[in-house]
Amino acid sequence: MNDFLSKDDYEEPKCLLNMHPEVTSIPVGRIIDKLDFYLSRNDHDAAERHLRYWLSEAESCHDMRGKLTVLNEQIGLYRKIGKESECLRAVSDALSLADSMDIEQSLTYGTTLINAATGYKAFEKAQEALPLYRKAKTIYESALDSNDGRLGGMYNNMALTLTELGMYREAEELYQKAIKVMEKQKNGELEVAITYLNIADLISARDGLENGEKEIEKQLLEA
């Protein structure tokens, strides 16, 4: 297992010592491809170093969009490997950067909000996550086609947070919306099944296993 950055990781656009203040874009596509390679090998240490390196490069290059992309990837990585303080720092940095970029109505902003909310939710901060999901929902519903699969994923994640907060009616409404979207996706059957299982969990949390037995069984049969 290679624990060090290879030349391929850093040979493209690099702003040495910030001597060139003009904006130069970091190679986002290659960065994500290399990240996926490290994750496919469960080489999380290399993945962390990879993202830290390119975060520094984006800052040196004044590439704020590239920096936001790297921060979003850091949120996902640190959430995956359970590094709470690092994840929450990336969440804070991503939200601050996005707020400074005049992109409030863009899908990029909406996606950043969802990633940040998911990061909060992963570390038992559902209260902090919910307002971010609400803002993202407004953006996604305005910018995306009503059958776009990204909406289904957002509805599901937001509903999980609502369930954790005991807001069951709104959560169930979003689960039903998620099902309608995911039923129209190619190979969406798995996501639909997962959503029915989530509804069963909601009923169990709301009514208890005994009182909700029949309704839970119904959802499990749908799944």
Predicted regions and their residues:
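Alpha-helical segment of the N-proximal tetratricopeptide repeat
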Residues: I26-S56, S60, G76, K80, ...
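Alpha-helical solenoid repeat scaffolds, predominantly canonical TPR units
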Residues: H50, A90, L97, L132, ...
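TPR-repeat structural position
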Residues: H44, M64, E84, A126, ...
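Amphipathic alpha-helical segments of tetratricopeptide repeats
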Residues: L55-E57, L95-S100, K137-S142, I179-K184, ...
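Single-residue signature of alpha-solenoid repeat helices
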Residues: A47, C87, A129, A136, ...
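Repeat-mediated protein-protein interaction surfaces in helical alpha-solenoids
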Residues: L5-E22, A46-E57, L95-S96, T138
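Conserved alpha-helical positions within TPR/SEL1-like repeat arrays
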Residues: G29-S40, T69-K80, L107-A122, G149-E164, ...
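Short coil/turn linkers that connect adjacent helices within long alpha-helical scaffolds
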Residues: H20-E22, S60-D63, S100-E104, S142-S146, ...
